[in-house]
Design a protein with these regions (language model features):
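Positively charged n-region of N-terminal signal peptides that target proteins for export
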Residues: 1-4
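Ankyrin repeat boundary/linker residues
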Residues: 53, 86, 121-122
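Ankyrin repeat domain, specifically the short helix-to-loop turn at the C-terminus of the second helix
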Residues: 40-48, 73-81, 108-116
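C-terminal motif of bacterial Sec signal peptides marking the signal peptidase cleavage site
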Residues: 15-16
Length: 125
């Protein structure tokens, strides 16, 4: 009986301490659609906050392009790099200011956290 109790307790502890599985939607797809709950699930499951898609976009690139400030704040709080460059050297800030003139709140947020454009990074060497 004592062995069964210890085994049960150990199983409960192991299950309770494991990471939850990521959702059935990619972190990039969740970012496109503003699905903050799926993003949170990905991060809790250990998905890389700076995971790149086929063209080198991170989730932060996606939300900067789509105007998802709340998700941008979450990703930055979880350690997302604000200066990761994708294809053509584009950073999340490039996407917030060049292609979407109404993304000033996200551009300001990125700047507050050290965000730079690809051209600024290139000039720094």
């Amino acid at each position: 009986m004592k062995h069964l109790l210890l085994t049960t307790i150990a199983a409960v502890v192991l299950v309770g301490c494991s990471k939850p599985p990521p959702p059935n939607i990619s972190i990039h797809h969740a970012a496109v659609h503003g699905n903050i709950e799926a993003i949170k699930q990905h991060l809790a499951a250990g998905t890389d906050v700076d995971a790149k898609d086929a063209i080198g976009w991170t989730p932060l690139h996606v939300v900067a392009d789509n105007g998802r400030k709340e998700i941008a704040e979450l990703l930055i709080a979880k350690g997302a790099s604000v200066n990761t460059q994708a294809a053509l050297g584009l950073t999340p800030l490039d996407l917030a200011i060049r292609f979407r003139s109404n993304r000033t709140e996200i551009a300001d947020l990125l700047r507050e956290h050290g965000g730079k454009t690809g051209e600024e990074l290139k000039a720094e060497g």
